Structure formats: C-alpha cells, structure tokens
C-alpha cells in the first residue's frame, strides 16, 4: 500500500475568448490562464492489488461515481497504458468552489493523471501526457504544466508566458449560485 497527499490548485482566466463550435462539439478558445494559490487536497492510496477506483469527497454535491472526472482520468489512463486496473482510493477535500470557472475538477484530473504516470514509472513524457489529458477535458492539459500560459485551440495549444502580475486578487463566489462549464459553453 502506498499513500500520497497532493494539492491540486485552481486557475484563473485572464481573459477568455470563445469561438465557434467544431464538429466534435468542442469550442476553439483563446485565453491566458494562470495558476493560483487555492487548492483542493487529495489523499490517494494505491493498494497494490487489482481493483477499481473509489472516491470520497468532503463536498456532498460532488458526485463520487462515474460522473466524477477522476473516474474518467482513471479509466483513460489504464485503457491507454494497457495496464491492469489497480485498486485506488481517493479522498477529495474540496476548497476550490465548484461551478466557479476556476478549473477545480480539471485540476484534480490533471494532478491525478500526473501522479498515476509517476507511480507507474513515467510511461508518458510531458507532451504525451498533455495529449492524454486532452481526452479527459479541455482544461486538463493546462494543469500538466501548471504555469501561466496562453491556451488556444480546444485547450490543446499551450504556450508558456511570463506572468508579470504582482497584485493580489480577491475571488468572490456566491454560495448557492454557480454555472457549470459545460452549460456555459453550450450557450455559445
């Protein structure tokens, strides 16, 4: 049994342009994304035996079944790597508010994917990991590098840039109000 504690940080969009929807259902975007110091905490246990993924979450509004992006990450990693599924448990302590455009789920997925890759001997290099991340979600590749970047295409074109912002930011998210990323993009 191997235990890990990882912190998956949020991101902000410093401007976001959303363009036409492609035939595959994804929109092209152009955005500047920057990581921020607000993180979820994940306690992850690898049991060194065959099995499945079990997710628990401090936020009861977050699904812990196949609808959770961590399941998609787990499934895609094992399918693509051709490794047998191992029993893994994740306890997700949420601090990043959901439905706030801060990339909480994508961050969880990106950091979990990086840990899976490391745990199984760095099967993928960074570029391959970004391509795998794109199969999970369009914000997930950003969290592979997790540095300020201009993100374009469908989220798959990531160009690191210098972050000269020195000011602090204040984020305000109403408690009982949010917009899912999927719903926001469907309005375009």
Per-range role (PLM):
Residues 78-89, 115-132, 136:
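Phosphate-handling active-site elements
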Residues 88-100:
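Short pre-catalytic strand/loop immediately N-terminal to key active-site residues, enriched for Gly-Thr
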Residues 2-31, 122-188:
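ATP-dependent small-molecule kinase catalytic core of the GHMP/sugar-kinase superfamily
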Residues 2-86:
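N-terminal beta-alpha supersecondary unit
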Residues 42-44, 89-92, 149-152:
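Broad, structure-driven detector of short, well-ordered beta-strand segments within folded domains
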Residues 29, 55, 62-63, 98, ...:
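Short clusters of hydrophobic/aromatic residues that line enzyme substrate/ligand-binding pockets
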Residues 53-55, 102, 180-186:
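Short, charged, solvent-exposed linker or helix-capping segments at domain edges/interfaces
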Residues 70, 100-130, 142:
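DPxDG-like acidic metal-binding loop motif
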